Amino acid sequence: MTAPRAPFFPADRSIRASDDPIEVQHLGTVDYRDSWDLQASLAEQRARDEIADQILVLEHPSVYTAGKRTQPEDLPTNGLPVIEVDRGGRITWHGPGQLVMYPIIKLAEPIDVVDYVRRLEEALIQTVRTFGVPEAGRVDGRSGVWVPAHDGYPDSKVAALGIRVTRGVTMHGLALNCNNTLEFYDHIIACGIEDAGLTTLSRELGRDVPTTELVDPLISDLDDAFAGRLTVADHSFASAPDPTRALPKRG
């Protein structure tokens, strides 16, 4: 496995530009475009130091979103509409039962996007492991949080990431599969990955796991990861090709 580069900051230092508490907005179920507009507005305000850092907590009605590296062969075969977005990555699905969090965070200088992504992953890994999936970790070369192959299932992604940083402020974020259906993934090449699977916490734990169970623990772990109280560790259990490397950006 290729050794990751060292972050710009010490592992125990905050990656945030501010020490003020993060404000959390619990939004319920929100149309994707409405949430995107809200993020853009908040990011502009945060860049001007008019508001504190935010984390938006929500779910979406069923929708496909296509990041900048989405390829024609990734697109859905079931006729559902696709929203082209300004985050990184390729195509994914959002819908009921999937916990979505969008941190609007002003990053400290010098901005280290890779470290920010690793801290998002670290928070997710901590939360998922605490909930009873101790094997959860990373696949080198691929973003997100993964569960190793077991019981006939391949290595499977349980949480996806896609971010954008503009004027030093983060947008978009993470999606954690709790008790959502996986059927909508059957009609796309999710994140451009054809040689792995997808899973939910409900499937891994053998019980229904609603999104509400994960909100407070994940918020706490994100806060700790951003602050450096939860430090990034090597949780990689496999390596695989990066499905976005060297692909052209859309538009």
UniProtKB/Swiss-Prot annotation:
GO terms for molecular function: lipoyl(octanoyl) transferase activity. Residues 49-230 form the BPL/LPL catalytic domain. It holds the Pfam family LplA-B_cat. One of its GO terms (biological process) is protein modification process. Pathway: Protein modification; protein lipoylation via endogenous pathway; protein N(6)-(lipoyl)lysine from octanoyl-[acyl-carrier-protein]: step 1/2. It is found in: Cytoplasm. One of its GO terms (cellular component) is cytoplasm. Its main location: cytoplasm. It catalyses: octanoyl-[ACP] + L-lysyl-[protein] = N(6)-octanoyl-L-lysyl-[protein] + holo-[ACP] + H(+). The keyword Glycoprotein does not apply. Keywords: Acyltransferase, Cytoplasm, Transferase. InterPro entries: aa-tRNA-synth_II/BPL/LPL, BPL_LPL_catalytic, Octanoyltransferase, Octanoyltransferase_CS. The active site is at C191. Substrate binds at R87, G88, G89, R90, I91, T92, W93, H94, A160, L161, G162, G173, L174, A175. Its EC number is 2.3.1.181. The record marks K157 as: Lowers pKa of active site Cys. HAMAP family: LipB. In the reaction, the free carboxyl group of octanoic acid is attached via an amide linkage to the epsilon-amino group of a specific lysine residue of lipoyl domains of lipoate-dependent enzymes. PANTHER family: LIPOYLTRANSFERASE 2, MITOCHONDRIAL-RELATED (PTHR10993:SF7), OCTANOYLTRANSFERASE (PTHR10993). Belongs to the LipB family. This is Octanoyltransferase. It comes from Corynebacterium efficiens (strain DSM 44549 / YS-314 / AJ 12310 / JCM 11189 / NBRC 100395). The lineage of its organism: Bacteria, Bacillati, Actinomycetota, Actinomycetes, Mycobacteriales.
